[in-house]
């Protein structure tokens, strides 16, 4: 379960939402993955702003450059951090943060084909196809597929 949220957590950033991408990504994926996976994706949004020296997670330098050293998170982010840090799936969300830093390193090359088996075994693809099912997230996948659709 741990690898899947790491692989999928930025789906909404790639798609269309940068702000609150963890919340959007979790909602997009929730109907198709185990609850722990969507929870981890949602909560990494908050955890990424808070160091955890016990697992070797420091506040990312790229965040300090982007947001500034004195950046204060929004109250909802602080609240979700407090919820997540004592949750049984804390490390699933924290592992996203620990492994996310590789995406900021231009020297790290990752080939998605290496992970197709993991995704295929754990992602519950609807028979009708993403966006064609009746899940609460179907409209997001339709928008992703056709962002310029007039109606």
Spans of model-derived segments:
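Divalent metal-dependent phosphate-bond-processing catalytic cores, especially two-metal-ion Mg2+/Mn2+ enzymes
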Residues: 17, 31-39, 43-151
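Post-HEXXH active-site segment of zinc metalloproteases
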Residues: 15-31
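Catalytic glutamate of the conserved HExxH
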Residues: 10-14
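Short, small-residue-biased leader/transition segments that mark boundaries at the very start
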Residues: 1-4
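Histidine-centered active-site/metal-ligand motif
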Residues: 9, 21-25, 43-44
């Amino acid at each position: 379960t741990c690898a899947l949220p790491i692989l999928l957590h930025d789906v909404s950033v790639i798609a269309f939402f940068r702000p609150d991408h963890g919340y959007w990504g979790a909602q997009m994926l929730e109907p198709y993955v185990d609850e722990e996976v969507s929870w981890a994706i949602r909560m990494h949004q908050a955890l990424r702003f808070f160091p955890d020296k016990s697992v070797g997670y420091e506040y990312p330098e790229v965040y300090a450059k982007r947001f500034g050293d004195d950046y204060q998170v929004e109250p909802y982010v602080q609240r979700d951090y407090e919820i997540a840090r004592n949750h049984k799936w804390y490390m699933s969300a924290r592992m996203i943060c620990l492994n996310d830093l590789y995406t900021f390193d231009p020297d790290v090359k990752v080939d998605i084909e290496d992970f197709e088996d993991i995704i295929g075994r754990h992602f519950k693809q609807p028979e009708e196809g993403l966006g064609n099912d009746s899940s609460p997230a179907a409209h997001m996948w339709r928008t992703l597929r056709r962002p310029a659709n007039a109606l």
